[in-house]
Amino acid sequence: MRADADRDSAETRAAELRARILDADHAYYVLDRPVLADAEYDRLVRELAEIEAAHPELATSDSPTQRVSGAPSERFERVVHREPMLSLGNIQSDGELDEFDARVHRLLGLAGDVQVGYVAEPKLDGLAVELVYEGGRLVQGSTRGDGVNGEDVTANLRTVGRTRANRGVPERLAGEVPPRVEVRGEVLLFKEHFEAMNRQILRAGDEPFANPRNAAAGSLRQLDWRVTARRPLSFIAYEALVPGAEPGGARAGPWAWRTHAEKLEALARWGFETNAENERCEGIAAVKAYRDRMAERRFALPYDTDGVVVKVDDLDWRRRLGAASKFPRWAVAFKYPPQEEATRIRRIWASVGRTGILTPVVDFEPVRLSGAMVSRATLHNEDEMRRKDVLEGDWILVRRAGEVIPEVVMPLKERRTGEERPFAFPAECPICGAKVVREEGEKVYRCTGAACPAQLVGRLTHFAQRRAMDIDGLGDKLALGLVERGLVKDFADLYAVPFPAWQELFSRPRKEERDAKAELPQKSAQNMVDALERSKATTLRRLLFALGIPQVGEATAATLARHFGELARFMDASEDALLAVRDVGPETAREIRAWTEEPQNRRVVERLLAAGVRPAPETVDAGGPFAGKTVVLTGGLAALSRDDAKAEIERRGGKVSGSVSRKTDLVVAGAEAGSKLEKAQALGVRVVGEEEFLRMLEE
């Protein structure tokens, strides 16, 4: 019983962690609006990885530990990378660096005294992109996206660095070049250019960018390339891939490199800027010495950096080392400890979220951390605030590692004067005036107001998010504008907002769009109307998640959708019928039934259907090659995202698992398949490639 309880607790925590990490990924990579500090994000990922290591059966195929974090926006055409653009595993200690070196030795079968050659370089804080050249001419440029699919931003990339020699994207390569080459690197803003750009923004009376990374991403991902052209972006190249010339391929021509250092030399010959701080290191001790030198110089460098990237230099060794589903085994990123600063609290106040939860927010005197000015942090709940013993008026230590929202580390009690006071949660909601309560056994205070505007804004953005109704462009500011103007009181109202109202909401361009064409408000309004129309064709699982039903996260929404099949059956399900659903317990069943019985909720659902929202019934194919089978996905697929492949398998009656065991029926191996493929082969599990997998889907 104890083991079952521990597993249930681990499963619940893993689901919570995945949800927080995926939301943070979406905010960082898609919206260019970070919501977590690096240190907090890394802590959540590590905690999730530890849970999945202790309970392999809980490792889902869509877990953030299994894939690259970004996601392509629907504002741009999708580009499929020939080779996945994987992210790097993060480490933070000498011990982890030694473990990385030992793992390289072990996987290559090298004796412990063999010095592995590494290339070390500063970890750039910008936007990863891929440039494709054919016959020496630029034919396509794309963002990394989710690692398999990126965004086509060719027109924008052609403008990068045109005003600064050797810091741009060449239109044509110099010298002898292969028929096709894929160049990867980082689009970034140097500190001097970032500060100059922000000064111009401030003179115009607008809000400056928080940091160079956000500014670079926002500048590159513009619908109007002329906006990008006016931004002082730079490009630094760090990788080149030539089809057939990688180790194990044809290895023909002068670009059949043996080492990464040779690649960097070729990139420089072709006209790219490479990082002048790159250094080849013999052995891990030399890497540590380089890391220490860079840590001392990091703030003197012309760009922001939060660590050092370490790569095996020998390309044949890289091929042998391969990659896991998310990270290459031949490279790692060593991240510096979060920078810390002392500052003084101005005030503590309570913000109200979509579920009515009041969160204590700390406003403090602005400090510069990791290149950005920050002045706010959250304390999550009253218990954390009391545990850290943070008082209004305190001097505090805050830290940040590249994100917008910092973390309060501790109060500096030795600097207290006696005038500091504990923060007391308000008895009434600061937004709507309704009563605020903290129920017995709960850690949070909640607003009891059913019509609270702050809750409505939160519910609208939840409804619109990518994994729910996927209404591209509907974020916090737009939702607030809708609520303030009285245009929207529930989800269904979104589909009734008239076109002129959307135009009015978009009439003041955002700072990154102020240089765009004059018809931008009309174009933005039309884009929003189109996004709303597209969202009407959804699935039952997405709609159930979007509605914000208590206790119904993504996983539960999918389970409910598969069980009931149709929205009407779900809405009319009794508490007993809900209890019959796998993984739905008594509390969840009660919460769901209370929600579906509420007349206002039923009216909103009816109005959504009347507006044209049509959730496709969840049907399960009882026949076919996947029915009743347990399938594991590994590596990147060119034709489908991991989420789409999982959905197709489940729709055909299969179950997708995150780990390979003797109970696994099938492994689908895409590009750069990792240890799961090796384990499947060792266990004799059937393995199919992407081409055969797509044929099976058509059966």
From Swiss-Prot:
Listed GO CC annotations: cytosol
GO biological process, one term: DNA replication
A Pfam family the protein falls into: DNA_ligase_OB
Listed Gene3D superfamilies: 5' to 3' exonuclease, C-terminal subdomain, 6.20.10.30, BRCT domain, DNA ligase/mRNA capping enzyme, Helix hairpin bin, Nucleic acid-binding proteins
InterPro entries cross-referenced by the UniProt entry: BRCT_dom, BRCT_dom_sf, DisA/LigA_HHH, DNA_ligase, DNA_ligase_AS, DNA_ligase_CS, DNAligase_adenylation, DNAligase_N
SMART domains given in the database record: BRCT, HhH1, LIGANc
EC number(s) per entry: 6.5.1.2
Function: DNA ligase that catalyzes the formation of phosphodiester linkages between 5'-phosphoryl and 3'-hydroxyl groups in double-stranded DNA using NAD as a coenzyme and as the energy source for the reaction. It is essential for DNA replication and repair of damaged DNA.
This protein's name: DNA ligase
Organism: Anaeromyxobacter sp. (strain Fw109-5)
